[in-house]
Structures are given as structure tokens and as C-alpha cells.
């Protein structure tokens, strides 16, 4: 069985992430969506909220061969512990590629048996970023349906706007 891990902060999960997960399923038998924690990053949602929301969204989409997990540490270590040979990374633009390629080089030095698969974003999701969702969320009456599923919007709205 070909298994891949798709790591990210998912702060929050977007249609861009979901598109990459769907496309990964065309390549792999199983995809583990890994809600990762980067200690140098400041998050909008707590670790538990990011994990719970990502898990709820994946569940609502009825993906039978997608699991959601969480991890704090090097993704390559998670892959090794779980006998996963592939890491999927999404690429929106050239600057994403620069960052992801550097991660690939580090991972390759740590364990050359784990491959990184770079998937470019679909044209309709090139502009979708969790950062934009967070900024737009602070505005009232903004339609975020092109950025996030309704479940995400409602959860964020109840947390940040309805208070």
C-alpha cells in the first residue's frame, strides 16, 4: 500500500488543502493529513482546534482513505516512525518551491529513503492561503466560500466574530 503524509499547519484548512488531498489520492492509496506544530510559528487557532477542525472537515467530505493525525517535530521523523515513504507538499508559487525544496534537502539528509512529492496548486486555488482567510475573517460580511468550506467558516465565525 502506497501511503503519503501531507503535513501542514491547517490554520485553518482551506479548499486549496482539500484539492491537494484529493489529487494526492489519485497517486497514493492512503493519505495522512498531518496537523503539524512549528514552534517558531504563531497560530490563529490552538493545536487542538486546528486538529479538530481539520478532522471534522475531512470527515464531512467522506474520504475513506484519509486519516488526520497531529505531530510536533520533524515530518521526516513522523514518516519514519509510521513507515511512510512519501511526503506531499503543495506549491503555489516560486517562493513556495524555494522553501519546500530546502525542506526536501534537509529531509533527504536526515533520511534519503523518504521522497517528497511536489504538487502545484490548481489554478483556481493559487490565491487561497490560510493567511488571507485569517485577515478576511476579521472583516464582517465577507464571503469566504471560495477559500474554506462552510464548516470552517462557521467555526471561525463562532469563535472570532460572534463574540
Swiss-Prot record:
<keyword id="KW-0067">ATP-binding</keyword>
<feature type="binding site">
    <location>
        <position position="17"/>
    </location>
    <ligand>
        <name>ATP</name>
    </ligand>
</feature>
<keyword id="KW-0460">Magnesium</keyword>
<dbReference type="InterPro" id="IPR004821">
    <property type="entry name" value="Cyt_trans-like"/>
</dbReference>
<dbReference type="GO" id="GO:0005524">
    <property type="term" value="F:ATP binding"/>
</dbReference>
<feature type="binding site">
    <location>
        <begin position="9"/>
        <end position="10"/>
    </location>
    <ligand>
        <name>ATP</name>
    </ligand>
</feature>
<feature type="binding site">
    <location>
        <position position="100"/>
    </location>
    <ligand>
        <name>ATP</name>
    </ligand>
</feature>
<feature type="binding site">
    <location>
        <begin position="90"/>
        <end position="92"/>
    </location>
    <ligand>
        <name>ATP</name>
    </ligand>
</feature>
<feature type="binding site">
    <location>
        <position position="41"/>
    </location>
    <ligand>
        <name>substrate</name>
    </ligand>
</feature>
<dbReference type="GO" id="GO:0004595">
    <property type="term" value="F:pantetheine-phosphate adenylyltransferase activity"/>
</dbReference>
<dbReference type="InterPro" id="IPR014729">
    <property type="entry name" value="Rossmann-like_a/b/a_fold"/>
</dbReference>
<comment type="function">
    <text>Reversibly transfers an adenylyl group from ATP to 4'-phosphopantetheine, yielding dephospho-CoA (dPCoA) and pyrophosphate.</text>
</comment>
<keyword id="KW-0808">Transferase</keyword>
<dbReference type="InterPro" id="IPR001980">
    <property type="entry name" value="PPAT"/>
</dbReference>
<protein>
    <recommendedName>
        <fullName>Phosphopantetheine adenylyltransferase</fullName>
        <ecNumber>2.7.7.3</ecNumber>
    </recommendedName>
</protein>
<dbReference type="Pfam" id="PF01467">
    <property type="entry name" value="CTP_transf_like"/>
</dbReference>
<feature type="binding site">
    <location>
        <begin position="125"/>
        <end position="131"/>
    </location>
    <ligand>
        <name>ATP</name>
    </ligand>
</feature>
<keyword id="KW-0548">Nucleotidyltransferase</keyword>
<feature type="site" description="Transition state stabilizer">
    <location>
        <position position="17"/>
    </location>
</feature>
<comment type="subunit">
    <text>Homohexamer.</text>
</comment>
<keyword id="KW-0547">Nucleotide-binding</keyword>
<dbReference type="GO" id="GO:0015937">
    <property type="term" value="P:coenzyme A biosynthetic process"/>
</dbReference>
<feature type="binding site">
    <location>
        <position position="75"/>
    </location>
    <ligand>
        <name>substrate</name>
    </ligand>
</feature>
<feature type="binding site">
    <location>
        <position position="9"/>
    </location>
    <ligand>
        <name>substrate</name>
    </ligand>
</feature>
<dbReference type="GO" id="GO:0005737">
    <property type="term" value="C:cytoplasm"/>
</dbReference>
<comment type="similarity">
    <text>Belongs to the bacterial CoaD family.</text>
</comment>
<keyword id="KW-0173">Coenzyme A biosynthesis</keyword>
<feature type="binding site">
    <location>
        <position position="89"/>
    </location>
    <ligand>
        <name>substrate</name>
    </ligand>
</feature>
<keyword id="KW-0963">Cytoplasm</keyword>
<comment type="pathway">
    <text>Cofactor biosynthesis; coenzyme A biosynthesis; CoA from (R)-pantothenate: step 4/5.</text>
</comment>
Amino acid at each position: 500500500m502506497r501511503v503519503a503524509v501531507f503535513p501542514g499547519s491547517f490554520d485553518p484548512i482551506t479548499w486549496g488543502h482539500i484539492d491537494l488531498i484529493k489529487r494526492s489520492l489519485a497517486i497514493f492509496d492512503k493519505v495522512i493529513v498531518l496537523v503539524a506544530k512549528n514552534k517558531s510559528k504563531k497560530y490563529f487557532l490552538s493545536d487542538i482546534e486546528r486538529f479538530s477542525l481539520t478532522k471534522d472537515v475531512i470527515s464531512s467530505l467522506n474520504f475513506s482513505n484519509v486519516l488526520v493525525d497531529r505531530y510536533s517535530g520533524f515530518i521526516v521523523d513522523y514518516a519514519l516512525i509510521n513507515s511512510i515513504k512519501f511526503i506531499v507538499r503543495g506549491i503555489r508559487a516560486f517562493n513556495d518551491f524555494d522553501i519546500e525544496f530546502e525542506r526536501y534537502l534537509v529531509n533527504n539528509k536526515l533520511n534519503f529513503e523518504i521522497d517528497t512529492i511536489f504538487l502545484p496548486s490548481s489554478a483556481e486555488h493559487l490565491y487561497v492561503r490560510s493567511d488571507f482567510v485569517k485577515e478576511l475573517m476579521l472583516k464582517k460580511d465577507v464571503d469566504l466560500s471560495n477559500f474554506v468550506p462552510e464548516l470552517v467558516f462557521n467555526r471561525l465565525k463562532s469563535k472570532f466574530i460572534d463574540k
